[in-house]
Amino acid sequence: MAASFSVPSMIMEEEGRFEAEVAEVQAWWNSERFKLTRRPYTAKDVVSLRGSLRQSYASNDLAKKLWRTLKTHQANGTASRTFGALDPVQVTMMAKHLDTIYVSGWQCSSTHTSTNEPGPDLADYPYDTVPNKVEHLFFAQQYHDRKQREARMSMSREERAKTPYIDYLKPIIADGDTGFGGTTATVKLCKLFVERGAAGVHIEDQSSVTKKCGHMAGKVLVAVSEHINRLVAARLQFDVMGVETILVARTDAVAATLIQTNVDKRDHQFILGATNPNLRGKSLAGALAEAMAAGKTGAELQALEDQWISMAQLKTFSECVTDAIMNTNATENEKRRKLDEWMNHSSYEKCISNEQGREIAEKLGLKNLFWDWDLPRTREGFYRFKGSVMAAIVRGWAFAPHADLIWMETSSPDLVECTTFAKGMKSIHPETMLAYNLSPSFNWDASGMSDKQMEEFIPRIARLGFCWQFITLAGFHADALVVDTFARDYARRGMLAYVERIQREERNNGVDTLAHQKWSGANYYDRYLKTVQGGISSTAAMGKGVTEEQFKESWTREGAVNLGEEGNVVVAKSRM
C-alpha cells in the first residue's frame, strides 16, 4: 500500500503567497479605477503569469497621474490638449503649458526609427521605434526634473518663492499602431512601453499587414473580435506588470473601405455586396486574374475593376433590403410597415448577422434577394466595407469595456460627426472618455470655420466628452517652419537674422534655452564635481570665463556695442 503524500511546508507557503497575491489583484480590480473594465480572464491567470520578483515602474506613477488628469477634465467638460513631441527640447517647453505629452508613430517613422531609415507612416519600422522615443523623452523629463530640484534647493526661500515651479513629469501617451502583429507581439510591445516610460498607449483596428496613416487611403480593418483581442492582450500585460497604464482604442472605421474578414457578425451590417444578378458567378478577383493572364496591366486592370464595381451596384445588405421593399408593388402603407419592421429587427445596436438578416428578409416576402459579399472581394481577399460614423460607433461600443478611452479617426474637423459619435457612445457607455485627433492632415482653412470657431473647437468638443485632444504632428510642423524660415533669412542676412529671429525672441519670451548651457544642465553637473571634490572644482563648466555670463547682464540694443570710426568694436562703458 502506497504511503500517503504529506505536503511539505514550503509548498503550503508557496500556495499561501500565491493566493494572497491573487486576492491583492482582485482587490485592485475592484477599485474605482477599473469599475468600467471587463476582463475575460481571472486574477489567478494574471498572478500565474508573473514571476516571483515583484517590480515597480516609474511609468505607473505617471499613469495614475494621467488617469486623474483625464477624469478631472471629463468631470469639468474640459480637455487635456497636447501635441506630438519630437525631442527633449520640445518636451521641456511643452511642460510649462500642457498637462500631457504625445508621441506620434508618424513622427517617429519619418524622423527617428530604430534603424535610422525614414519613411511614411506604414508601421513598417522596428517595433521598438516608438518605445525608444518614449524613453528618450522620459529620460529627458526625469533629468530636467532633477536639474530643477538642484537649482531650487540652491536658492533661498525668497528666491524660490519668486521662481515658478515647472512640472516636467507630464504623462506620455504613445502610438502603439496596430500592436505590431499577433497577440504575443502586442504583449511584448506593451511591456516595452511600460518599461520605457509611457503612461498611456493607443492601439488601432487596422490590419497590421496593410496599416496606413489614418489620413491615407486603402485602409483595411480587422474584425471587431480581433481588435478586442489586441486590447485584451494589452490589458493583460499591464495587469501582469501591476500597472494602470491608460489604454486608448482607436477605430479607423469612418474612412475604411476594406475589411479582412466577415467572421464577426458585428461587422456584417457594414460589408458591401454585389446586387446585380448578371454578375452571379463572375467575381472581381476572377475577372482580374483572367485579364492579367491575357497580358493586361496597370491602367487596363484599373479600368476593368472600375467597370466591374460600377456594374455590381454595391450595397450593404440593409440597403439591398430597403430598396427591394420600396420596389415592390405593395401599397405605400404596406411598404412603410415592412420598412419599420425591418429597421426594428436590424437596428445597429442589435448587430444581427447576415444569416439572421436573410431570415428576416424572407419573412417580409423577399425570398429571391440577390446580394453577394464574396463577388466584390479584392485580389488580396478583402471584403468591401462601407465606412461611416455609425460603423465607428458600433466598434466603439464593442471596444469600450476593454479600453479607457475611445478615439474615432476622422477625415475632417466636423462638429456634426463629433456630436453624432459622442451621443452614440454615451447611449450605451455614458462614462467612457473620448479622444480626438486635431490632425494637421486637415486643411483647417478649408474647413469652413472662422478663426473664432477654430479657437472654440477644442472647448466645444470637450463639452461633448472628448477629454483628450492632440495635434499628432505639431512638433514636426513647428520644427520645419522655424528652421525653414530661419535658414532662408540666415542665408540672406547672416547673424542679424539669428539675433532678431532667435536670440531676442528667446529673451523677450523668457525661453530658457537662451542660456543653453544652464538648460543642458552644466550647473547640475558642476554640483556633482564640487560634491565629489569637497565643495570646490577648478574645472567647473560654469566657472569664471563661461560666455553665458553675458546673458545675466542688462543689454540694450543701443548700449551694448557700437562701432568706432575705424570699424572696430567698442565695448560700452557699462561692460568695461
Swiss-Prot record:
Name the record gives this protein: Isocitrate lyase
Active site: 213 (proton acceptor)
Family (UniProt): Belongs to the isocitrate lyase/PEP mutase superfamily. Isocitrate lyase family.
Main location: other
GO cellular component terms listed in the entry, alphabetical order: glyoxysome
MF-aspect GO terms: isocitrate lyase activity; metal ion binding
Pathway the protein contributes to: Carbohydrate metabolism; glyoxylate cycle; (S)-malate from isocitrate: step 1/2
EC number: 4.1.3.1
Binding positions for Mg(2+) per the UniProt entry: 175
Residue runs in coiled coils: none
Source taxonomy: Eukaryota, Viridiplantae, Streptophyta, Embryophyta, Tracheophyta
GO biological process: glyoxylate cycle; tricarboxylic acid cycle
One Pfam family in the UniProt entry: ICL
Compartments in which it is found: Glyoxysome
Extent of motif Microbody targeting signal: 574-576
Function text: Involved in storage lipid mobilization during the growth of higher plant seedling.
